[in-house]
């Protein structure tokens, strides 16, 4: 089963897929002129609540338009909890970072915030949850 989740922004491709009991949420982002990006999980204009336990997060810089070295990534719940617990700071622009054993229960829409990435750079973030 696959559920496509898309926001109204043309700068994001956000979708979920289901593999057995594991689900995958993917954000493909492009930063604005200030090097920032922010997007909440939405479906047809409504907040899309993630229900489950986050197990793994991958932060992947684009190969052709990579972000500035040392950019920051935060994934937060509606109550402001940083799912990455601050580990999304100072990301390398030439390597995928994978965070295992997150084990954070979530019952909230999630917001991806990228900062310090440089003008119109790209990347993606994958969140695996059960």
Where are the model-predicted features located?
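Surface-exposed, low-hydrophobicity beta-strand/loop segments enriched in small/polar/acidic residues
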Residues: 2-130
């Amino acid at each position: 089963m696959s559920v496509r989740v898309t926001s109204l922004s043309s700068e994001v491709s956000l979708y979920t897929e289901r593999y057995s009991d594991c689900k995958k949420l993917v954000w493909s982002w492009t930063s604005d002129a200030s090097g920032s990006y922010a997007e909440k999980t939405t479906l047809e204009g409504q907040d899309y609540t993630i229900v489950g336990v986050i197990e793994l997060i991958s932060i992947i810089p684009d190969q052709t338009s990579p972000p500035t070295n040392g950019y920051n990534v935060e994934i937060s719940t509606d109550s402001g909890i940083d799912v990455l617990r601050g580990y999304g700071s100072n990301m390398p622009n030439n390597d995928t970072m994978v965070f295992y054993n997150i084990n954070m229960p979530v019952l909230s829409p999630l917001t991806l915030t990228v900062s310090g990435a440089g003008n119109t750079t790209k990347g993606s973030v994958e969140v695996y949850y059960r």
